[in-house]
Amino acid sequence: MRAFIFDEAGTGKTKRSMDLLDGAEHILVICPASVVKTAWLPQIGQWSYGKALTIEDYRKIGWPEDYRFLVVSYNMAAKLGEVPDGFSLIVDESHMVKNPRSGRSKTVKGISDLAKDVLMLTGTPAPKDLEDLYGQTVVMYPHAKDRTALLGDSWRTLGTFRMRYGKPYTMNVQGRLVVKYTYSKPMVEEACRQLQKLVLDIRRGGNPLPQVEWLPSPKTEQEDVAFEQWTNTHQLAEDVYAASASAAAVKLAQLDDGFAYKTEDRGESYWFGVSKLKTVYSEAKRREDPTPLLVWTRFKAVRDEIYRTWTPCTDAKTFLAMTGQERGKYRLIVANPQSMGTGVDGLQHLIKDQIWLDLPWTYADWEQANRRLVRRGSPYQGQQRILVPDTPWNRKVMDVIEGRKTLDDIVKEKQLG
């Protein structure tokens, strides 16, 4: 059996994968490092049978016959040596092997080639575009002949995949023309119909995401002036726009948050405005709800500034590990949506409202983060709120998330007012 499990967050992908492999004698789990001990080992004990070991144990004693599970992180998977014949493989958060050229993907692909069964789990199968699905399929079926037998010749190589489903366009990247591919909705639908042969019935949480609430967040004249200075005097148009849409969008998101990095190593930041932070603080202060407010931001500079200017404050994983008495004093919890995996399962029982300082570029990333709270088992069903500071940039990114525009579109609109 080789299959994808694309179930929504909170619907039990982990348990489902173990149930499907109930008859397997040995199971190798490859997952993010953050969930080896916080999610997989506890859930193996709760939902399955047999002993489990980690890479630390494996490097000392190998994989003894009487141990059913071996759980390793993506980073340590390359350290594996001998494994039992006929083992089964679970690849958790499989979108992490979406790039067939990466060392991580090549390592897991080699392991997959040796496995009897392969289950690949993710709630965000295509974080960036359709090519993410192709990359994961290469890991599931390492040999082109097997992929083409199931999915057709278009899935033989990335080149044939692009030729069938994509439309090429050129862009200038640091002075040279590079060919990129865009995928229309009909082509995405056609590719997904083919891939459906490998996808188990998708389980959905049944809880729709709440309607976004836009919070007024007017910028000061000083912030507008500083924004213009940074975009003009720091050659944003020439240096960043020429690199890629995502690089430009990251820079624009930082400026919208009110800061810019002074140095390339991002060791020092310059803050010229705090209107968005004030929006967060105002919401936290006026809340009558006893639960804290979860603040999403991907930038370390923003998290550091919140820690400096609002106390007490902590990150989501630390908050989750606290006792009930310790949690009571916190009104703000900070989290990075890019590193929030299943290691924070349980947060939905403690927090109901979330606010986004800066938004992701894809609906998949948006939904996965929001589903950390809006999921089965939450005692706050129907009461959760998703809040976003109302700035022109956040409005434009929401257009991308909801499919009305592309990242290229909004980056080309240099005038953000």
Regions found by a protein language model. Give the residues of each.
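Conserved RecA-like P-loop NTPase helicase motor core
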Residues: 73, 303, 312-397, 403-404
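Conserved P-loop NTPase motor "coupling/switch" region that bridges the ATPase
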Residues: 88, 105-204, 378-382
